[in-house]
Amino acid sequence: MNVRRVESISAQLEEASSTGGFLYAQNSTKRSIKERLMKLLPCSAAKTSSPAIQNSVEDELEMATVRHRPEALELLEAQSKFTKKELQILYRGFKNECPSGVVNEETFKEIYSQFFPQGDSTTYAHFLFNAFDTDHNGAVSFEDFIKGLSILLRGTVQEKLNWAFNLYDINKDGYITKEEMLDIMKAIYDMMGKCTYPVLKEDAPRQHVETFFQKMDKNKDGVVTIDEFIESCQKDENIMRSMQLFENVI
């Protein structure tokens, strides 16, 4: 990891602890998300000019090695913000890494650990996997991947905030508790490992969670609803700015 980027992430972590942010930046660049997720699809960038790319996804589905068949290309195109050609490229890359057509959690963790070798990304990858696994069947299909990627790369602020809320709502009950936020925060700090400079305080995750709830738990009932979450994020420039760190760890 580039030293300057590490220092930048460290600074953002410190800012997040003081502002209660740490979810998504309204004006942040999309390169980091795209680069990380495209690493899961190593053949996607290298074959864009190959004639084989022009083959339809429907033809690819006939291959016996693919056990999970994705939805019709036209339906995925309608449900996402990708073009038909982009979906073809993404599907080839996905299938190259995952011939079965789905990614289980262990494989997802192995892939994600390559992004943060200096720390332990296991727990955070678990939470991220569950955010992509929208039907909660223990596997991320091509459809799951595309729908999540479409929001992260090309979604509106509202869509991204909804996606981020789902990530922090670990038990998917429609609320974010202090315990859930603390679990996510600890997982992120574990993932960053010893690469941060200056070294973050041991109680930084807990301090951040307390600040987060002071800003977002409007009725002081100990949980944050989706409405409280979105309203607070959109009204607080500090929160929106510090949300940029989320792109660096996605």
From Swiss-Prot:
This is Kv channel-interacting protein 4. One of its GO terms (cellular component) is peroxisome. Residues 237-250 are annotated as: Interaction with KCND2. It comes from the Eukaryota. Component of heteromultimeric potassium channels. Identified in potassium channel complexes containing KCND1, KCND2, KCND3, KCNIP1, KCNIP2, KCNIP3, KCNIP4, DPP6 and DPP10. Interacts with KCND2. Interacts with KCND3. Interacts with the C-terminus of PSEN2 and probably PSEN1. Regulatory subunit of Kv4/D (Shal)-type voltage-gated rapidly inactivating A-type potassium channels. Modulates KCND2 channel density, inactivation kinetics and rate of recovery from inactivation in a calcium-dependent and isoform-specific manner. Modulates KCND3/Kv4.3 currents. Isoform 4 does not increase KCND2 expression at the cell membrane. Isoform 4 retains KCND3 in the endoplasmic reticulum and negatively regulates its expression at the cell membrane. CDD domains: EFh. GO terms for molecular function: calcium ion binding; potassium channel activity; potassium channel regulator activity. GO terms for biological process: protein localization to plasma membrane; regulation of potassium ion transmembrane transport; regulation of signal transduction. SMART domains: EFh (SM00054). Signal peptide: none annotated. It comes from Homo sapiens (Human).
